[in-house]
C-alpha cells in the first residue's frame, strides 16, 4: 500500500495509530542526531521523525534532499508541548518513522517553492514545480470547488451537460479565429470556436430546453492580464425564459459558487444599472461599485464661457465635460497630480484640470486652481453640484465623450485604490439595456456590441427603418463584480426575418449571411423557441474569487502574453512531411525571416 492517509490529514485523532504516507520532501532538518522531514502532498504537511537507532533507515534519511519523493510508514505520536506548531493542521503530532523508502530522487530545483519573488518566466518554464507551491495548490482547489458547484447547481435546476464541436466553421465573431487546415478537404479550413454560441442556440431549436457546458474557447487576439488565446467558460442556454428569469437563475448560481467556493455569502439581491447610467456615473460599462466616487456632468454650466478647452466639448454633441470629486483629495501633492495627469494620458486625455477646495465659505478665494479665473461665475455652482467640501479636490475631463469616460473612469478606480477608498469586499451589479450597435471607428462600419444574434428591443420593421441604429437598445445583460465582467448574456433572436434584418444592418449581404450562417438561418425556419443564455468566463471568475492578479495564476498551464507556452516551447515548427500532407508551404519571405 502506497498510503493510508494524506499527509495533511494526519492529525491528533490518529494518535498511536500506524499510518503510511507518501509525498515530497518539503524540508529536512538535523537536530541533535535526529532527522526531521516535513513531508508534503496535496493536502498539506506532516512532520516525520527519523531516529538514529535504525542505522539503515537513518542513512537513507541523511541522503534525502528537497523534492525527493518518499514513502514513510510509522506511528503517529503527540508532540511535546513546546514543539507544537499551531500554524499547521498537523502541528500537534508527528510520525515516528519505522520504514522509509525513496520512491524518486530529485536534482536541485531552480527555485525554492516558498520564494515569493520568482519571475513569471521561470514559474511558467517550470510550471510543474510552480504548481507544487501551496499558493498554486490552493488556487487550483478553489477552481475545482467552483466548477463542482456550477455543475451541481445546474444539474439540480434541470440543465443537461452537452458537448459542442471544437472543429467548426469560421464565422465572424469579432476576434480572429485560430484556423486548422483540413487534410481531407484541401484548401479548406476548420476554425477553433470562439464560443459555442451558434451550436447552443441550435440545441434549443432541437428541444433540449436547458443546456450547459464548461468548455474551451479560442481567440487569436492581443493578450492582456485577463486574456488568453485559449480560455474556459461556463456556457448556458435556456428555452422559454425571459431575461429576468435567466438573470435570477444566474444570480442564484453566482451566490452558490461564491458560498461553496470561497465561503462568501451574498445576502441581498444584486442591484441593476442601465448601460447609460454606468457610463454617465462611472465612465465604464463594468463599474467597480466598491469605490464611492462618481462622475458628474457639468457641460451645461460651461457652454457659454470663453475657455475653449471646456466650452468646445460642452457644446459638441459628441463631447463631454465631467467632474470627479475626491473627498479630502486636496492633500494630493503636485507630483501626485502630475502622475495622475500622465495616467489619464494613456486613455487619450490631453490634460487633467483640477480645483482644490480650501474654504468654501470664502467663495472663489477659497478655491485653488489655475482654471477658476476662466469661469468665475460658474465655479461655485459646479462645487455645489458635485457636493464639494473643504479639503476636497475636483478633477475635470473635457474632450470627446469616449475619451472623457475612459480617462475619468480609469482615474476613478486608480484614485480609489491609491487612497484606500474601497468600502467593501464584494460589489456585484447587473448592467442592462446595452446599445445593440456601435460604430467601429477604424472601419466606419456598424458592429454588434455583444454579437449579431442578440435580440434588439425593437421590431423587425423598426430595425430596418431606424435612423440612428446606434441608439437602439438590446436585450443583453452583463454581470459585473468589483469592476470585472464575470459573465454576459442576452435574449437571442428566434425569428428568421429579424435575424436577417440585424445581419443587413451590420452590412452582411444575403450571400455572405448564407455562406457564414446558413445552417442557423435555415434552422430558424423550422420552429425556433424563444431562448436566452449566458456565459461566465471561468478563468476570470476564479481569478476574482481567489484574489489573484492574472488569469495565468488560475490556469494550470497558461500561455504568456505573446501566446506562447514557456513549458513546451509551443508554438513550434513542424516538418515538411506534415506540411505536404496538408498541401501547405511557407512563402520564401517568411522562411527567410524565420531563419534570420
UniProtKB/Swiss-Prot annotation:
Entry keywords, A to Z: Aminoacyl-tRNA synthetase, ATP-binding, Cytoplasm, Ligase, Nucleotide-binding, Protein biosynthesis
Binding site for ATP: 219-221, 228, 485, 537-540
GO biological process terms held by the UniProt record: aspartyl-tRNA aminoacylation
A matching Pfam family: tRNA_anti-codon
SUPFAM superfamilies: Class II aaRS and biotin synthetases (SSF55681), GAD domain-like (SSF55261), Nucleic acid-binding proteins (SSF50249)
Entry's localization field: Cytoplasm
Chain residue ranges for the region called Aspartate: 197-200
Broad class of where this protein is predominantly found: cytoplasm
Catalysis performed (reactions): tRNA(Asx) + L-aspartate + ATP = L-aspartyl-tRNA(Asx) + AMP + diphosphate
Binding site for L-aspartate: 173, 219, 450, 492
The enzyme's E.C. designation: 6.1.1.23
Alphabetized GO MF terms: aspartate-tRNA ligase activity; aspartate-tRNA(Asn) ligase activity; ATP binding; nucleic acid binding
Site positions (Important for tRNA non-discrimination): 31
Subunit and partners: Homodimer.
The protein's role, per its UniProt record: Aspartyl-tRNA synthetase with relaxed tRNA specificity since it is able to aspartylate not only its cognate tRNA(Asp) but also tRNA(Asn). Reaction proceeds in two steps: L-aspartate is first activated by ATP to form Asp-AMP and then transferred to the acceptor end of tRNA(Asp/Asn).
Family named by the database record: Belongs to the class-II aminoacyl-tRNA synthetase family. Type 1 subfamily.
This protein's name: Aspartate--tRNA(Asp/Asn) ligase
Organism: Hydrogenovibrio crunogenus (strain DSM 25203 / XCL-2) (Thiomicrospira crunogena)
Lineage: Bacteria, Pseudomonadati, Pseudomonadota, Gammaproteobacteria, Thiotrichales
Amino acid at each position: 500500500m502506497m498510503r493510508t492517509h494524506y499527509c495533511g490529514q494526519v492529525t491528533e485523532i490518529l494518535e498511536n495509530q500506524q499510518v503510511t504516507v507518501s509525498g515530497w520532501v518539503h524540508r529536512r532538518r538535523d537536530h541533535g542526531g535526529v532527522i526531521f522531514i516535513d513531508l508534503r502532498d496535496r493536502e498539506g504537511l506532516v512532520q516525520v521523525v527519523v531516529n538514529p537507532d535504525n542505522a539503515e533507515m537513518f542513512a537513507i534519511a541523511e541522503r534525502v534532499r528537497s523534492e525527493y519523493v518518499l514513502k514513510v510508514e510509522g506511528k503517529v505520536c503527540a508532540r511535546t508541548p513546546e514543539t507544537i506548531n499551531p500554524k499547521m493542521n498537523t502541528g500537534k503530532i508527528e510520525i515516528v518513522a519505522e520504514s522509509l523508502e525513496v520512491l524518486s530522487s530529485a536534482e536541485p530545483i531552480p527555485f525554492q517553492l516558498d520564494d515569493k519573488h520568482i519571475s513569471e518566466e521561470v514559474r511558467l518554464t517550470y510550471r510543474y514545480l510552480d504548481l507544487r507551491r501551496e499558493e498554486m495548490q490552493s488556487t487550483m482547489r478553489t477552481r475545482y470547488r467552483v466548477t463542482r458547484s456550477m455543475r451541481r447547481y445546474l444539474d439540480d435546476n434541470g440543465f443537461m451537460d452537452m458537448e459542442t464541436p471544437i472543429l467548426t466553421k469560421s464565422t465572424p465573431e469579432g476576434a480572429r479565429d485560430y484556423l486548422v487546415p483540413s487534410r481531407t478537404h484541401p484548401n479548406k479550413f476548420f476554425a477553433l470556436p470562439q464560443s459555442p454560441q451558434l451550436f447552443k442556440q441550435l440545441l434549443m431549436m432541437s428541444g433540449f430546453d436547458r443546456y450547459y457546458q464548461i468548455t474551451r474557447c479560442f481567440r487569436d487576439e492581443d493578450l492582456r492580464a485577463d486574456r488568453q488565446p485559449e480560455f474556459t467558460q461556463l456556457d448556458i442556454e435556456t428555452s422559454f425564459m425571459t431575461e429576468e428569469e435567466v438573470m435570477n437563475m444566474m444570480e442564484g448560481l453566482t451566490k452558490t459558487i461564491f458560498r461553496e467556493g470561497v465561503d462568501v455569502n451574498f445576502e441581498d439581491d444584486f442591484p441593476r444599472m442601465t448601460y447609460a447610467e454606468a457610463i454617465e456615473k462611472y465612465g465604464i460599462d463594468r463599474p467597480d461599485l466598491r469605490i464611492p466616487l462618481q462622475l458628474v456632468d457639468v457641460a451645461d454650466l460651461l457652454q457659454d464661457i470663453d475657455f475653449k478647452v471646456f466650452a468646445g466639448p460642452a457644446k459638441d454633441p459628441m463631447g463631454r465635460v465631467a467632474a470627479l470629486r475626491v473627498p479630502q483629495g486636496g492633500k494630493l501633492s503636485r507630483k501626485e497630480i502630475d502622475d495622475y495627469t500622465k495616467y489619464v494620458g494613456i486613455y487619450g486625455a490631453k490634460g487633467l484640470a483640477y480645483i482644490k477646495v480650501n474654504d468654501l465659505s470664502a467663495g472663489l478665494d477659497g478655491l485653488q486652481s489655475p482654471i477658476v479665473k476662466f469661469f468665475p461665475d460658474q465655479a461655485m455652482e459646479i462645487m455645489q453640484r458635485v457636493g464639494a467640501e473643504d479639503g476636497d479636490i475636483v478633477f475635470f475631463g473635457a474632450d470627446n465623450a469616449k475619451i472623457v469616460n475612459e480617462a475619468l473612469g480609469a482615474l476613478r478606480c486608480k484614485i480609489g485604490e491609491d487612497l484606500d477608498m474601497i468600502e467593501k469586499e464584494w460589489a456585484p451589479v447587473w448592467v442592462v439595456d446595452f446599445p445593440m450597435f456601435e460604430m467601429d471607428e477604424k472601419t466606419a462600419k456598424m458592429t454588434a456590441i455583444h454579437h449579431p444574434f442578440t435580440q434588439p428591443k425593437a421590431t423587425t420593421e423598426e430595425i430596418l427603418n431606424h435612423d440612428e441604429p446606434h441608439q437602439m437598445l438590446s436585450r443583453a445583460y452583463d454581470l459585473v463584480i468589483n469592476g470585472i465582467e464575470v459573465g454576459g448574456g442576452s435574449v437571442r433572436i428566434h425569428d428568421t426575418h429579424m435575424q436577417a434584418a440585424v445581419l443587413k444592418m451590420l452590412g452582411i449581404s444575403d450571400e455572405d449571411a448564407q455562406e457564414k450562417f446558413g445552417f442557423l438561418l435555415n434552422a430558424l425556419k423550422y420552429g425556433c423557441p424563444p431562448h436566452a443564455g449566458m456565459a461566465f468566463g471561468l478563468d476570470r471568475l476564479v481569478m476574482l474569487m481567489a484574489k489573484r492578479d492574472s488569469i495565468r495564476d488560475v490556469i494550470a498551464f497558461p500561455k504568456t502574453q505573446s501566446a506562447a507556452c514557456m513549458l513546451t516551447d509551443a508554438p513550434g515548427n513542424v516538418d515538411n512531411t506534415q506540411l505536404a500532407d496538408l498541401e501547405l508551404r511557407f512563402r520564401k519571405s517568411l522562411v527567410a525571416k524565420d531563419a534570420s
